[in-house]
């Protein structure tokens, strides 16, 4: 048990409505990739959600929660359109990621999609059933610009209930609750242990669910 777990759990219990559950809802891995990459260092509701909606309007009959939009479909569309035209005319976003050597986000999307294609991962079900989740995590983490937050968030979007995305809002909450910050790795352990303590009163609560509750609360204050 993490040494700060009890303190963090008490803070969450007293600060948030823990009955509010997140609905990620995507049924196609293509939009999970887009949401993941374009949410990093961006305003989620102002930038990411409209961007995913634009992709869905162009290719998914207007429904970002539709199933059947595979990784290979995303790759083919980017190849046919051209990466810059895809960025300019479909998702309409020219953001970059990656410290000093920044890379356009559409190139990060493409690289991640190609890695999945090489592993024969086309759907959310393929992702969830991949034979070695540890290898999958290493592969995702190797994509330029994703880091711990992007890696964990993609797992969350693809249905993993046991992860948190250690972004600026999550770390802000940890500092408020515990008086100090923790590493990304500790953040995962802290959320996991806090949820274990809270489940007696909140049996439906998951790590992913607590992450969503915390994130929405702190994002609204930003």
Locations of regions flagged by a protein language model:
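A basic, often C-terminal nucleic-acid-binding module that engages the phosphate backbone, implemented
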Residues: 185-222
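Intrinsically disordered, low-complexity, charged terminal extensions of DNA damage-control enzymes
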Residues: 1-17, 219-221
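Non-catalytic DNA-binding core/recognition domains of DNA-processing enzymes
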Residues: 28, 45-58, 65-68, 102-112, ...
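Catalytic DNA-binding helix-loop module of base-excision-repair DNA glycosylases/AP lyases
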Residues: 38, 130-180
């Amino acid at each position: 048990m993490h040494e700060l777990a009890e303190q963090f759990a008490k803070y969450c219990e007293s600060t948030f409505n823990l009955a509010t559950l997140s609905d990620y809802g995507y049924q196609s891995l293509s939009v999970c990739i887009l949401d993941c990459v374009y949410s990093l260092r961006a305003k989620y509701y102002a930038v990411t959600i409209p961007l995913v909606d634009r992709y869905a309007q162009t290719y998914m009959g207007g429904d970002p929660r539709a199933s059947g939009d595979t990784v290979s479909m995303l790759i083919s569309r980017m190849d046919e359109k051209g990466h810059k035209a895809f960025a300019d005319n479909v998702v309409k976003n020219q953001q970059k990621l990656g410290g000093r050597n920044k890379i356009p986000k559409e190139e990060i999307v493409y690289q991640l999609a190609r890695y999945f294609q090489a592993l024969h991962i086309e759907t959310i079900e393929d992702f969830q059933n991949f034979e070695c989740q540890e290898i999958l995590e290493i592969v995702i983490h190797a994509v330029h610009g994703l880091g711990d937050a992007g890696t964990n968030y993609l797992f969350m979007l693809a249905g993993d209930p046991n992860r948190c995305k250690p972004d600026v809002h999550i770390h802000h909450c940890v500092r408020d609750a515990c008086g100090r910050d923790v590493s990304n790795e500790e953040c995962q352990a802290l959320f996991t242990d806090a949820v274990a303590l809270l489940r007696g009163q909140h049996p439906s609560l998951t790590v992913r669910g607590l992450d969503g509750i915390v994130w929405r609360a702190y994002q609204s204050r930003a």
